[in-house]
A protein has these predicted regions:
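Charged, terminal alpha-helix-loop-beta segments
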Residues: 373-374
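Bacterial N-terminal signal peptides
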Residues: 11-20
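Alpha/beta-hydrolase fold catalytic core
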Residues: 138, 146, 277-370, 392
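Sec-dependent signal peptide cleavage junction
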Residues: 19-33, 511, 518
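Alpha/beta-hydrolase-fold enzymes
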Residues: 224-317
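Bacterial N-terminal signal peptides that target proteins for export
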Residues: 1-11
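Hydrophobic membrane-targeting and insertion signals
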Residues: 6-7, 25-28, 199
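N-terminal non-catalytic accessory region
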Residues: 29-174, 180-232, 360, 367, ...
C-alpha cells in the first residue's frame, strides 16, 4: 500500500513538472535581465488649472483669440501703416493686449512664484508592481513653470514612493525635452545612487534656439532659410485637396513670390516691420508669456543667457528673487551638466542619449540651418555631435581626417553627422526625420532595450538598433540610415517637375474651393 501511494505521488509530480515544462511560453511572464521600474519625466509638464479647476494650459486659445480679434488687429495694423511717425505702436499694443489676456492666469509673479492659485493635478500614487515594468507605469508629471529645484524635490519624493511599492533599490529614468531639465536638477541635488540608467530623449537641457531667441529678441529673416523651410513645408503638405483654404492661400502666395523672385523683397519689408514692432513689444511680450517662469529659463542657451536677462528684466530690482532662481539652475546645473553626467557614469549609472535630426528649425533665428528636429538643435540634444547644416554634407576633408584617426564608424551613412565628438559617442543614437513632438512605439522599443540590458547597452549591442536610424512616417517604424539618403533631391529634374505640377495643382484646388464657397 505504501509503495502504491509512493508511485501515485511520483506520477502526480511528474505530470505537474511536465505541464510546467510544456506549457506555452506566452503564458509565462517575460523575463528581463534588468527589470527595474521606469520613471518617465514627460516633456512640457502637464495641464495647469486655475483655482476654479478650469484648464488654462496647454492653451489652444491663441489661434482662437486671433480669430476673435481680427478686426482689432486689422484696425491697429492700418493705423500703424498710416501713422505720421511711421511706427507700429498701435499694432504692438494690440498684439500685447491679446497675448497678455490669453496668458494672464498662466504667468507667475515677479518672484517666479505661483500667487493666483493655479496648479497641476498631483501625480497618482505609484502602483504596486514587482516585475515586467513598462515605459508607461510611472509617468512623472510636473508644473513646467516653477523653480526646477521644486520639481527635483518632487521627483525625488516620487522615486522614493516607486522604490517602496516595487521593492527595488533603483529606478530607470528617462527625460524627454523639458523633462531632461528636471532630471538634470535631480542628479545635481540628489546624486545618482537610486538610478540604474538615465536616458535623455530629444533633450532640451542644454538649451534651444527658438526659446533663447524669443527671450533676447534675436529674430532674423534669412531668405535662403525661409525658402528651404517653405520647400520642406510644401513637400510635406497634402496636395490632394485635404489642405484647408487658408493653407492653400499661403502655399500659393509662397510659390508665386518665389517664382517671381519676390521673396527677398517680402522678407526685407517683413523684417523692417518686425524691428519696429519689437522696439515697443519687448520685453513686455516675453514677461507676458514665459519670462517669469523659472522652468522655461532652463532652456535658454548659454550663449544667449546673459543677454536674455538684460533684455527681459532691464536691471529692475523687483526681479531679484526670480533671477536668483534662474541663476542657480544656469550656473550650477546647466553649465556643469556634462561634468555631472560624467561623474554619475563613473559612479556606475548607465547613460544613453537619443537625438533627432534632419528637420529644420523655423527660419527666424541665426542658427536655423543647423541640424535639428524642428525645435532642438542636434548639437545640443546629442551633447556635442558635429553636424552639417540642413541640406549639406560634412566636408570631405573632415571625413577623411576622422577616418584616418580611426573614428570613421561614427560618421553617419548620409554624411551629415559625426558622433565621435559627443559626450558619450558609444551611447548616443540618432533618428532621422522624426519630428520633435512625435514619439512612436518603435523608439520605445529602443528605450526598453537599453533599460533591460544588465550591461551598458551600446550602439554595437544590437544590429537592429544601430547608431543611425531612419523614421518611416508611413509605417511608424525605424530602419537603418543608408548611403541611399545621399541623393540631393534639389538637383533632380523629376523633383523640379513635381514642384511645378504641385503649383498648378494648388492653384486649381484653390479656384475650385473658391467657387464652392461663393
Amino acid at each position: 500500500m505504501k509503495r502504491t501511494l509512493t508511485r501515485v505521488l511520483s506520477l502526480f509530480l511528474a505530470v505537474l513538472c511536465a505541464a510546467a515544462v510544456l506549457s506555452p511560453a506566452a503564458s509565462a511572464a517575460a523575463y528581463y535581465e534588468n527589470d527595474l521600474p521606469v520613471v518617465y519625466v514627460i516633456g512640457r509638464g502637464t495641464w495647469i488649472y486655475d483655482k476654479n479647476e478650469n484648464k488654462i494650459y496647454p492653451t489652444d486659445g491663441i489661434e482662437k483669440a486671433i480669430k476673435n480679434n481680427v478686426n482689432n488687429l486689422a484696425t491697429a495694423w492700418i493705423k500703424s501703416l498710416i501713422s505720421p511717425n511711421s511706427d507700429w505702436d498701435e499694432l504692438s499694443d494690440a498684439i500685447y493686449k491679446l497675448v497678455e489676456e490669453e496668458y494672464k492666469n498662466y504667468v507667475l509673479d515677479d518672484n517666479g512664484e505661483i500667487s493666483n492659485g493655479t496648479h497641476i493635478k498631483p501625480n497618482a500614487e505609484p502602483k504596486a508592481k514587482k516585475s515586467n515594468f513598462s515605459i508607461t507605469d510611472y509617468q512623472f508629471s510636473y508644473d513646467g513653470r516653477i523653480d526646477p529645484r521644486e520639481n527635483a524635490k518632487l521627483l525625488n519624493e516620487y522615486i522614493n514612493k516607486v522604490l517602496t511599492v516595487t521593492g527595488k533599490r533603483k529606478v530607470q529614468l528617462i527625460g524627454r525635452c523639458l523633462g531632461s531639465t528636471i532630471i538634470s536638477a535631480y542628479l545635481t541635488m540628489y546624486g545618482c545612487s537610486k538610478v540604474d540608467t538615465a536616458i535623455f530623449y530629444a533633450a532640451s537641457n542644454q538649451g534651444i534656439v527658438p526659446l533663447s531667441a524669443f527671450f533676447t529678441g534675436d529674430v532674423i529673416f534669412d531668405c535662403k532659410a525661409i525658402e528651404k523651410y517653405g520647400d520642406d513645408y510644401l513637400n510635406n503638405s497634402a496636395s490632394d485637396g485635404s489642405d484647408n483654404l487658408s493653407r492653400s492661400l499661403v502655399t500659393l502666395g509662397y510659390k508665386l513670390s518665389k517664382s517671381f523672385y519676390l521673396t527677398d523683397y517680402v522678407i526685407e519689408n517683413v523684417e523692417k516691420a518686425y524691428r519696429d514692432i519689437a522696439r515697443t513689444l519687448y520685453p513686455r511680450i516675453v514677461l507676458a508669456v514665459y519670462g517669469t517662469c523659472p522652468g522655461f529659463w532652463t532652456m535658454v542657451r548659454d550663449d544667449y543667457y546673459e543677454k536674455a536677462k538684460q533684455v527681459v528684466f532691464e536691471g529692475k530690482a523687483k526681479y531679484a528673487k526670480l533671477i536668483e532662481k534662474i541663476d542657480w539652475y544656469h550656473y550650477n546645473v546647466f553649465q556643469k551638466f556634462p561634468q555631472t553626467l560624467k561623474k554619475c557614469k563613473q559612479q556606475g549609472m548607465k547613460v544613453a542619449v537619443i537625438a533627432k535630426y534632419n528637420i529644420q528649425l523655423a527660419p527666424l533665428f541665426k542658427d536655423c540651418m543647423k541640424q535639428a528636429d524642428n525645435l532642438v538643435e542636434l548639437e545640443t540634444a546629442s551633447y556635442g555631435a558635429t553636424c552639417s547644416d540642413i541640406g549639406q554634407l560634412l566636408p570631405d576633408s573632415y571625413i577623411n581626417a576622422q577616418e584616418k584617426a580611426g573614428k570613421g564608424k561614427y560618421i553617419s551613412p548620409d554624411l551629415k553627422v559625426d558622433a565621435s565628438t559627443c559626450l558619450f559617442p558609444d551611447y548616443t543614437w540618432f533618428i532621422k526625420d522624426l519630428p520633435h513632438d512625435v514619439f512612436p512605439n518603435s523608439v520605445n522599443e529602443l528605450i526598453m532595450k537599453i533599460f533591460h540590458s544588465k550591461e551598458p547597452f551600446t550602439i554595437d549591442s544590437d544590429e537592429q538598433f544601430s547608431q543611425y536610424l531612419q523614421y518611416e512616417s508611413n509605417s511608424l517604424l525605424l530602419s537603418k540610415v543608408t548611403e541611399l539618403d545621399l541623393a540631393d533631391e534639389n538637383d533632380s529634374a523629376e523633383i523640379s517637375l513635381r514642384k511645378l505640377l504641385n503649383l498648378f495643382n494648388t492653384l486649381f484646388w484653390l479656384l475650385k474651393n473658391l467657387f464652392n464657397i461663393m
